Regions:
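Charge-dense, helix-prone N-terminal extensions
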Residues: 1-123
């Protein structure tokens, strides 16, 4: 089980990452992980859900693979159809897997110079 503290520690351990509003993490001005904004009531505003992360992935097709791998951890909703992000249940994900998922997401958004200089052992 991962915690918000694990997310913050892992994300801020990645080079040039900053924390933005609503527990979102950014590199080079690009978000790679943020809190899922859930719609509690139909036609109402979405509100951040502290138990679920939205994490950037390479391609939308990756969603199906992740969901099949572990549907207790990974899921999606219609709001994310056509968008390269997967939803992650914090209570269900192992911190080591969370580290891999966040590092992969960071690599997708980080500029080439950071990717080239980054060693996973640094995180």
């Amino acid at each position: 089980m991962a915690t918000p503290e694990d997310v913050r520690r892992i994300a801020l351990g990645l080079p040039e990452t900053t924390e933005g509003p609503d527990f979102g993490f950014v590199v080079d001005g690009k978000a790679f992980v943020w809190l899922w904004r859930e719609r509690i009531e139909p036609k109402s505003a979405r509100v951040p859900n502290p138990d679920v992360l939205a994490v950037r992935i390479a391609h939308e097709s990756e969603k199906e693979t992740l969901i099949e791998m572990d549907p207790a951890v990974f899921f999606t909703e219609p709001h994310y159809d056509g968008y390269p992000a997967i939803l992650v249940r914090l209570a269900a994900i192992d911190p080591a897997l969370l580290g891999k998922v966040l590092t992969d997401a960071w690599r997708l958004r980080a500029p080439r110079r950071l990717n080239a200089a980054f060693s996973p052992d640094e995180a």
